[in-house]
A protein has these predicted regions:
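Short active-site loop/helix that positions an aromatic residue
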Residues: 124-141
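Bacterial N-terminal signal peptides
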Residues: 13-24
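Conserved NAD+-utilizing ADP-ribose enzyme module
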Residues: 145-256
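Primarily extracytoplasmic ectodomains and periplasmic/lumenal surface modules that are beta-strand-rich
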Residues: 92, 101-104, 125-128, 169-171
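ADP-ribose/NAD+-binding catalytic cleft of ART/PARP-like enzymes
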Residues: 33-119
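Sec/Tat signal peptide C-region and signal peptidase I cleavage site
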Residues: 27-32
Length: 256
């Protein structure tokens, strides 16, 4: 996915311009500038963030074999990083999704049948990642958006943790199995035609002007890092899956 030098340079410029935000340093302490100059700088930073995100979307169109990550979180009982429970003898793994939808709020502790696909990451991967930063609320939200491959000011307000049976999860890549630590760029021979259609349709609709940097490699595109594009391991909960809502927590409380 890495683009040519000029695109990489633009990304570096974006990150340099955004360093004041990312390291949580007040602009007033960083620059000797008038209020008008500071406002102009803020507008420039916001513009550059949008450009950086769009470059990530364009970059993600081309998924290459050298970008395969061999350390994805596998959804297996022997993965001690995961959190499990058993209900009626069936194992369920704790997953989390970032959302602004209020439909989960009154379902805590209850079972719920999903009427849409829900994109999730395994608990506690996201919390472990964000704990290395000391950011104020605005910068923390931005870093989460970057890590999860979402556009800036995306409007997510809460994290919803849910218990999910592994059979209801798949990786959003040509190789949907969840029990290994990497994704193949090719469809396995046993993948159903309907799933191939799902992937191909997502490819056609994911990379436009208002698109998302879907890697198709089992991880989110971290467009805020200068060292790696690899974000969180991502999984989709199937439509019709019955899950148990564990908690609904606002963004700042969840990650602090």
């Amino acid at each position: 996915m890495k683009k040519q030098l000029i695109a990489v340079s633009k990304k570096l410029i974006t990150l340099i311009l955004g360093i004041i935000l990312i390291i949580n340093l007040p602009i007033q302490q960083s620059l000797a500038a008038s209020p008008e100059d500071l406002q102009e700088l803020q507008q420039l930073l916001e513009t550059q963030l949008v450009r950086s995100y769009q470059q990530a979307v364009e970059d993600a169109v081309d998924a290459r074999i050298d970008e395969i990550d061999n350390s994805l979180w596998s959804i297996t009982l022997d993965n001690t990083d995961l959190i499990w429970q058993k209900v009626d003898g069936k194992p369920q793994v704790l997953m989390v999704t970032w959302t602004s939808w209020d439909g989960y709020d009154d379902k805590i502790g209850e079972k719920m049948q999903l009427t849409r696909e829900v994109w999730t990451t395994p608990v506690p991967q996201l919390q472990t990642f964000i704990s290395q930063f000391n950011l104020n609320e605005d910068n923390l939200t931005l870093r989460l958006e970057q890590y999860l491959g979402l556009p800036p000011e995306n409007g997510k307000t809460k994290f919803v943790q849910m218990w999910v049976e592994p059979k209801d999860l798949f990786r959003p890549c040509p190789d949907p199995e969840i029990i290994d630590t990497s994704c193949s760029l090719k469809f396995p021979s046993n993948v159903e035609p309907q799933y191939q259609e799902w992937v191909n349709e997502k490819i056609l609709t994911s990379y436009g002007k208002n698109g998302y940097p879907w890697t198709r490699l089992g991880y989110t595109y971290d467009w805020g890092s200068i060292t790696t594009e690899i974000g969180a391991s991502e999984y989709v909960v199937r439509v019709g899956a019955e899950v148990e809502i564990d908690s609904v927590i606002n963004t700042i409380e969840y990650v602090q």
